């Protein structure tokens, strides 16, 4: 279960609220990935589907799953699940 968000935009997408500056189709893709993240019981669950391109970010203690080639969802992992969840333009 998602524990916390790093910004308001990510939380709005999770709640199904429209975010003007992000295209609707990209918001739908992000919500799909957030749903995968919310359902994960352990980090290993995020290796599927392979399109998540799940990996640890070097030296940060954060992890990443891909939404598309430009956008990612990054987060930390706690005993209770993902925290500090952030939908971000990674480039």
Tell me what each language-model feature is.
Residues 1-34:
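Arg/Lys-rich, positively charged N-terminal/basic patches that mediate binding to nucleic acids
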């Amino acid at each position: 279960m998602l524990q916390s968000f790093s910004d308001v935009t990510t939380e709005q997408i999770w709640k199904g609220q429209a975010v003007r500056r992000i295209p609707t189709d990209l918001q739908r893709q992000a919500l799909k990935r957030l749903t995968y993240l919310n359902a994960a019981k352990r980090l290993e669950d995020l290796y599927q589907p392979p399109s998540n391109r799940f990996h640890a970010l070097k030296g940060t203690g954060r992890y990443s799953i891909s939404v598309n080639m430009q956008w990612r969802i990054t987060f930390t992992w706690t005993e209770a699940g993902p925290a500090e969840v952030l939908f971000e333009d990674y480039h």
